[in-house]
Amino acid sequence: EFNHTGELLATGDKGGRVVIFQREQESKNQVHRRGEYNVYSTFQSHEPEFDYLKSLEIEEKINKIRWLPQQNAAYFLLSTNDKTVKLWKVSERDKRPEGYNLKDEEGRLRDPATITTLRVPVLRPMDLMVEATPRRVFANAHTYHINSISVNSDYETYMSADDLRINLWNFEITNQSFNIVDIKPANMEELTEVITAAEFHPHHCNTFVYSSSKGTIRLCDMRASALCDRHTKFFEEPEDPSNRSFFSEIISSISDVKFSHSGRYIMTRDYLTVKVWDLNMENRPIETYQVHDYLRSKLCSLYENDCIFDKFECVWNGSDSVIMTGSYNNFFRMFDRNTKRDVTLEASRENSKPRAILKPRKVCVGGKRRKDEISVDSLDFSKKILHTAWHPSENIIAVAATNNLYIFQDKVN
């Protein structure tokens, strides 16, 4: 996740660590090196825990990271695992106080009887240190696994969503939250869908959307009522009966939902497609992009190896003109909304020497395979790109492929 200026890039891993990369200042003005990032700070955000009431282990794995807009010299970010959201402050220190009266240089207290002179403490320069400190811990509000966090445009509140509920928090208050959506039925046997993702509108602090495992998107307005179980708008595409199959419901489940920067459009990702919806048109998306339609014939084996339940994310570029999402075999896809052109690129160690140009990849479905094409049957489904990020104003992208992070910039002639 890039911060709002794009100077920092935060990543979370399965071990509960957050690693922040900072853009190399010297390389910014050098055209061919402008996308260089180096490690800025690493800290342990979450530890493994155990829920003794339910006899369940709580993984430390980071599910989501969201930056807050910068208000002063320090940076603030939210990170969450399955149960607990934390607010972190990341700040720099290049001076330290020296010359305390009651403490010696090691920090031990001195006997007041030995103090004969009064000193004024002074600040001395020291090597730059980046400190990460937890400022707030928002816990005990989610029975189910948290899948989304989203910072509101009022910068005072944020929401966290799990499978059945969405809670609204104030950054200053850790011991209570407002439940704004609750889709849990009185009888759990009647449960037909779960919440898969949620996000606030980028400009209107009262509006948010959430998506479901049934492929629907609900837009809610908090001005209408305190509990937003009744939506303001309901986006759903009618199903084509000719495409109906055993897997229809599974592959229509939405894994990610994102507002465009302008706030006019919503992008959703299901298993095979990315769809763009206009907020003013609820009955069908205005654009549908096939991410990997060649997998339609492979759904049976993808179901058997559980890949069909993978949750791919999607991102907009800074001007909302290009969208990006991941696929298998370390492939990721980009779709240009204006020219309707699309490209498949690969993030792998074999073909990405520093500053090497990525070649478009093609997947062939049957018949004769050209030399530069890859056959559907030889795709590696264990190598998947679920998480991607796009710099807010430049063509610099970050792609997470298993335990590698790749940063690419657009080619300059």
UniProtKB/Swiss-Prot annotation:
GO molecular function, one term: protein phosphatase regulator activity
Residue numbers of Phosphotyrosine PTMs: Y265
Localization per record: Cytoplasm; Cytoplasm, Cytoskeleton; Membrane
Span of the signal peptide: none
Listed GO CC annotations: cytoplasm; cytoskeleton; membrane; protein phosphatase type 2A complex
Keywords for the protein's UniProt record, in alphabetical order: Cytoplasm, Cytoskeleton, Membrane, Phosphoprotein, Repeat, WD repeat
SMART domains for this protein: WD40 (SM00320)
Expressed in which tissues: Brain.
Positions of modified residues (Phosphoserine): S245
WD repeats: 1-31, 57-98, 141-179, 190-230, 249-287, 304-345, 380-412
Modified residues (Phosphothreonine): T268
Function: The B regulatory subunit might modulate substrate selectivity and catalytic activity, and might also direct the localization of the catalytic enzyme to a particular subcellular compartment.
Subunit structure: PP2A consists of a common heterodimeric core enzyme, composed of a 36 kDa catalytic subunit (subunit C) and a 65 kDa constant regulatory subunit (PR65 or subunit A), that associates with a variety of regulatory subunits. Proteins that associate with the core dimer include three families of regulatory subunits B (the R2/B/PR55/B55, R3/B''/PR72/PR130/PR59 and R5/B'/B56 families), the 48 kDa variable regulatory subunit, viral proteins, and cell signaling molecules. Interacts with TOMM22. Interacts with IER5 (via N- and C-terminal regions).
Family: Belongs to the phosphatase 2A regulatory subunit B family.
Protein's recorded name: Serine/threonine-protein phosphatase 2A 55 kDa regulatory subunit B beta isoform
